[in-house]
């Protein structure tokens, strides 16, 4: 959520920034929220004046009664003042609801460092690591490799649950588990994150807090007859961990790593990545979440991105980092990097991690602040997160980049201890 004061002080600049995002966004609601805010502030002035008058009348009534006089006229007048205050309170409640409705639907403002552009083709490549994998044979797609090795079962996944569901079996399930353990060990032992195991269901308030709702409700799985949602990412429960709390400045930055299943309806992805395990309704992911002071947050974003890169480097899979342009930025981020791994069957890089700084956008929605000292006024923190990284896409990248001409797949060196010393899946 944006700072309403920021909108009030410079509505035209806010509209310009939102227009630059390329969002399908009705700019007139900025004028609407400014108008509502002005009306609210005028009413608050009136209410304050009425409360002062009520206090004065109350004191005068007490004085008259102590003197044995008749204060009936003042009592009637004070009752009318109280009734007026109640009416204003009703108006204020209605205006506050309207303001909140609008504010929850206004996206974040891009950081000045975000590149111009509207499509993913406008994203700016920052760096690459390793050259794309070359083969002396025609490489297969990961769905064919997994099916041939009997480690991925798409047909039975479809039978049991429907499209975009997959059974991992045998060494496929072992590989997934190995990757999770490797990622968690690396981030906790090498990068200093605290591991946290979150709930897989959250309430509506939590989904609103991180920005999934109200805009993306059609992409969420809601539990029938209840206002719980299956989490689309561990970002939701972990960011809400400190909701309505004031943290100590000396404790920041705080870093968590969380493994969870993730559930997404993929309502806007019809026809995209229909084969394989790149885009599933249920998938596993290791998530990195940080809470930082404003002056720390962009340094922490670089560190978070490097942390996600490190685990991919350990697997020796070619990747690149791109800075996301304004039109591809998403609803909540102020600046975002994508890490994309090389996928031979696609003959291109495919996203495996997004690393974002939300500045105070989420913190205002979930009400997380910090104090440098107990006497200081609380300030909103900055929140950051990134995939550290997606497990299913890692499996796909390993199958494609480590495949051999006989149909087998070599196991990355760093995963061998987690795979019982095995060197190959065949």
UniProtKB/Swiss-Prot annotation:
What is known about its subunit structure? Homodimer. The tRNA molecule binds across the dimer.
Gene Ontology cellular component list: cytoplasm
Instruction: Please state the Enzyme Commission number of this protein.
Output: 6.1.1.11
Show the disulfide pairing: none
Xref: HAMAP family: Ser_tRNA_synth_type1 (MF_00176)
Domain of life per record: Bacteria
Q: What does the record give as its pathway?
A: Aminoacyl-tRNA biosynthesis; selenocysteinyl-tRNA(Sec) biosynthesis; L-seryl-tRNA(Sec) from L-serine and tRNA(Sec): step 1/1
Domain-level remarks = Consists of two distinct domains, a catalytic core and a N-terminal extension that is involved in tRNA binding.
Q: Which GO terms describe its biological process?
A: selenocysteine biosynthetic process; seryl-tRNA aminoacylation
Short name of one Pfam family? Seryl_tRNA_N
Annotated family: Belongs to the class-II aminoacyl-tRNA synthetase family. Type-1 seryl-tRNA synthetase subfamily.
| Reactions the enzyme catalyzes | tRNA(Ser) + L-serine + ATP = L-seryl-tRNA(Ser) + AMP + diphosphate + H(+); tRNA(Sec) + L-serine + ATP = L-seryl-tRNA(Sec) + AMP + diphosphate + H(+)
Look up and give the organism this protein is from: Clostridium kluyveri (strain ATCC 8527 / DSM 555 / NBRC 12016 / NCIMB 10680 / K1)
Q: Which UniProt keywords apply?
A: Aminoacyl-tRNA synthetase, ATP-binding, Cytoplasm, Ligase, Nucleotide-binding, Protein biosynthesis
Gene3D superfamilies, per this entry? Bira Bifunctional Protein, Domain 2 (3.30.930.10), Serine-tRNA synthetase, tRNA binding domain (1.10.287.40)
Location of the protein in the cell: Cytoplasm
Q: Where does ATP bind?
A: 264-266, 351-354
Taxonomically, what lineage is the organism? Answer: Bacteria, Bacillati, Bacillota, Clostridia, Eubacteriales
Give the protein's function.
Catalyzes the attachment of serine to tRNA(Ser). Is also able to aminoacylate tRNA(Sec) with serine, to form the misacylated tRNA L-seryl-tRNA(Sec), which will be further converted into selenocysteinyl-tRNA(Sec).
Q: What class of enzyme is it?
A: ligase
Q: What is this protein called?
A: Serine--tRNA ligase
Which molecular-function annotation in GO is an example for this chain? transferase activity
Residues binding L-serine, per UniProt = 233-235, 287, 387
